[in-house]
Amino acid sequence: MRILVLDDSIRSLAFSLTIQNSGATNEIHMISEKTEVGLSDSLKPGTNRDSHTMLQGIDHHMPKVAMAGSFLRNSWVHRGLAIESVSNGLNIHFRSAVNEVDRGIFEFHGTAGSSFGVSEHFDYVSHPPQANVGILWHGAVSTKSLAAEVSRDRGDGTFETWSRTQIKDSGILQHGRWVGEEPNEAVVMAIREGVTEAIRLLSSLK
């Protein structure tokens, strides 16, 4: 089966990795407009390393600073899943875009355009996750644990904090925003959604 994944989110990488780990033979292509996975200037919620079993499988892809604590930054998880997926055969096409010209038939632009013919057919297409809805959370990376907030030690002398109110402190290095119900569950929920889609697809093939 030829599978096309239309973004490089944590959810989509979890989908790809679940398909790959199923033992089924599939050709998976992932499209990204970025130059590399996890490349973002915005702060996104991290997670505990033991929050999902899939994270244990990418532990060896984590930077050394991550080994000292239990907290994993969002970008570390993102890159770790990508490295593991690529090592299992995922084809990621960076700086690329795609248009569907007919049902299941796509045209590729950018670097992916040189890898494919004029048009390519795929048996299954995994679409990007819908935009989050819910509460607006304010995030911050700071040089100290912030009072009256749940701050997570990032392992390098900085702390990550998410709050429903704006965070103001002299030691803040970076601000961020995230929309959803619970920042501490953001990574786990994305992984679960990807796994669920993959299991649904695999079940339909039996």
Model-found features: residue ranges?
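Positively charged, amphipathic N-terminal segments that serve as targeting/anchoring signals
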Residues: 53-54, 73, 82, 86-94
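N-terminal FAD cofactor-binding segment of flavoenzymes
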Residues: 11-67, 75-76
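N-terminal Rossmann-like FAD-binding beta1-loop-alpha1 element of flavoenzymes
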Residues: 1-29, 184-206
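Predominantly flavin-linked oxidoreductase catalytic cores and closely associated redox partners
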Residues: 87-205
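Short beta-strand to alpha-helix junction loop
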Residues: 64-84, 99
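Gly/Ser/Thr-rich loops at beta-strand to alpha-helix junctions
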Residues: 9-12, 73, 131-132
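Fold-independent oxyanion-binding glycine-rich loops
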Residues: 8, 32-34, 128-130
